[in-house]
Amino acid sequence: MKFETEHGCVVSEMATAYGNSKQIGRYAIAATMNEVLTRAERVDQMEIRVCAPLEEKKKHLYDVKAEAARCAREHGQTFWEPEIIRAAWAAGTFVQVNALAAEVKQQAWNKETMRAGQDIVLTKWIGLEGTLRILDEKRSELGKRFSGTFLHQVEEFRETIFAEREIRVAKAGGVSVMRQVGEGGIFAALYRLAKEADTGLVVDLKAMPVRQETIEICEYYKLNPYQLASTGNILMICDDGEALADALRKEETEAAVIGRLTDNNDKIIQNGEDIRYIDRPAPDELMKI
């Protein structure tokens, strides 16, 4: 969210992550950091809250708090001491993060103008956030189905939910607009993008990078990877998508041109010879876990 001021503007974002894992704060921190950085040079301040039902064990809450604080420090964030809140209204444990950037100056990359004909670039592999969160919550069950090596490969992608590097590259590479994929997955993000741009779009499903690990875990739980949480994936709108994707790949970030904005209202997904239209965003597939 952006607020105009006499000195520029203020960018403020909030994200919430639910779950039983002590890692849940990482996802909320990554989501807010990425969102702010797509509109500002840096995050100036972060606020972290751990909320839980009255009966939640104290040790678990302090573990969640400690992990969130450690993650924020690792990524160079300034934050107030995380707060723990127990409440009767809380249905489960969650971490809420607010992040703020003050006095943001307008530059070429944050004028946020989109038009038909521009390319859509997608960074990294879709659904990795959701894949990691399923692993966090269902590790024992997954261990009976998949090898330890397979699960370790998933773990190695834990830092991919943070997008500082590719956002920095895009700012120098002619990007017009950046939007995080996030909750609801790539289908929801594309729908929101087209509505915001007041254009249509056409994208190639086969061009969207997805890890085999995500596909197999989604098949096991009968989930759609294209509707799975994707914090860390950034949609980038620019005039020359191939040049931007090349610049990102040179910085060791997976990137692909997946489509373009069009001068109508159709939101089209091509899958070989098949064509379908993007529906209104559905609930994130994580809700089924």
Residue ranges and their predicted role:
Residues M1-I289:
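Helix-biased detector of long, well-ordered alpha-helical tracts
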